[in-house]
Amino acid sequence: MSRAILIVLDSFGIGATADAQRFGDAGANTLLHIAEACAAGACDSQGRTGPLRLPNLNRLGLGRAGEASCGAAAPGLEQAPEIIGTYGFAEELSSGKDTPSGHWEIAGVPVLFDWGYFTDKQQSFPPELLDAIIKEARLPGVLGNVHASGTQIIKDLGMEHRATGKPIFYTSADSVVQIACHEETFGLQRLYELCQITRKHIDPYNIARVIARPFVGASPEGFRRTGARRDFATPPHKPTLLDKLNNHGKQVIAIGKISDIYAGKGVSRSVKADGLGALVEATLTVMNETDEAAAKQDTLIFTNLVDFDMLYGHRRDVTGYAKALEDFDAMLPDLLGAMMDDDLLILTADHGCDPTWPGSDHTREHIPILMYGKRAPHGFIGARKTFADIGQTLAEYFQLDRLDFGESFLVADK
């Protein structure tokens, strides 16, 4: 039987797409700009120094994929090691640069319509929408109602929130409503219930996600977001690869926020973990648990590594992003070592979030495709026209019918 491990390095783009100008992202390049900053000494800290060092990702072809994407070699990744897998890059067919669009397209369902957005920087949400939420959730009111950085807004409004019980509502350039509440004074379960109420009321606005942003602490300097974040996404508009796997008796194990992104659709089992190390460890645990089970049931293990995006991309923390990449690279041999002979491993991303770029939003970029396994073609698979090529490849690997979008790059079974 077959087993595949699909890991999304959330926001790890490798070069602006041809249509990036339309998003204000022409020239963005998450990988290249991090590598350039490291080479210039701008990322030297107590935790790391010198050029960006990603030897294991580079052996899978990351450096070559990055250079093929943008025409420039990332400093520290120029040396051409012996490539042990498949490498390439893909552009996005979907209309946006958000998490659901990227993940759904990876699973064969690009978002070809436009999401709804709250574009006003101040007084961002329609009064009638907030009034309906306040009434149903029995709130004393709301705070925020702006475009904001999630870490900054809890510093600015966290004390007032604790004193009044008014939740903090904010948004961004993404199709999203984010709600920040104190875990202890407001309550975590109450925050989740508020997000479910909000999800219902924003459906007519075609908004992709409501995100619960719990935090703790007693002062602006001490406030910090916790790992109890939850995403309340609208379900995919068509069956994804996950649904098709489930419908054919195959197992989909979602690790991290994957289940939330697909609104639970097509997920056999969800495993929650918080932090890069914990998410990789959870992936390894599931790989070890399914060693024997995989002989009886085809299994897709699907992990999202959110820290790259949430902690470093949006916060424009170049040093933190570089160190996290190096930390993941050091964990990669454990993942490769846990693979069975016929396993397939795919590493990719869902969009960019260049930490050197102005603002705090995602960037429209190519994503890397790095693949390892017996049926992975050796070397360069070129520029792919859609993220859905990943889903189509997995559909072929699991012997499913063709998906509506994408072209497989799998080699024939030997």
UniProtKB/Swiss-Prot annotation:
GO BP of this protein: 2-deoxyribose 1-phosphate catabolic process; 5-phosphoribose 1-diphosphate biosynthetic process; metabolic compound salvage; nucleotide metabolic process
- What keyword terms does UniProt attach to this protein? Cytoplasm, Isomerase, Manganese, Metal-binding
Q: In which pathway does it act?
A: Carbohydrate degradation; 2-deoxy-D-ribose 1-phosphate degradation; D-glyceraldehyde 3-phosphate and acetaldehyde from 2-deoxy-alpha-D-ribose 1-phosphate: step 1/2
- Annotated binding of Mn(2+) 2, by residue: D309, H314, H362
Q: Where in the cell is it found?
A: Cytoplasm
Q: Which HAMAP family match?
A: Phosphopentomut
Its primary localisation, in coarse terms, equals: cytoplasm
UniProt catalytic activity? 2-deoxy-alpha-D-ribose 1-phosphate = 2-deoxy-D-ribose 5-phosphate; alpha-D-ribose 1-phosphate = D-ribose 5-phosphate
Q: What is this protein called?
A: Phosphopentomutase
A GO cellular component term found in this entry reads:
cytosol
| Molecular functions per Gene Ontology | magnesium ion binding; manganese ion binding; phosphopentomutase activity
Which residues bind Mn(2+) 1 per the record? Answer: D10, D350, H351
| Gene name of the encoded protein | deoB
What family is reported? Belongs to the phosphopentomutase family.
Question: What cofactor does its activity depend on?
Answer: Mn(2+)
Q: What does this protein do?
A: Isomerase that catalyzes the conversion of deoxy-ribose 1-phosphate (dRib-1-P) and ribose 1-phosphate (Rib-1-P) to deoxy-ribose 5-phosphate (dRib-5-P) and ribose 5-phosphate (Rib-5-P), respectively.
What does this protein's record comment on cofactor binding? Answer: Binds 2 manganese ions.
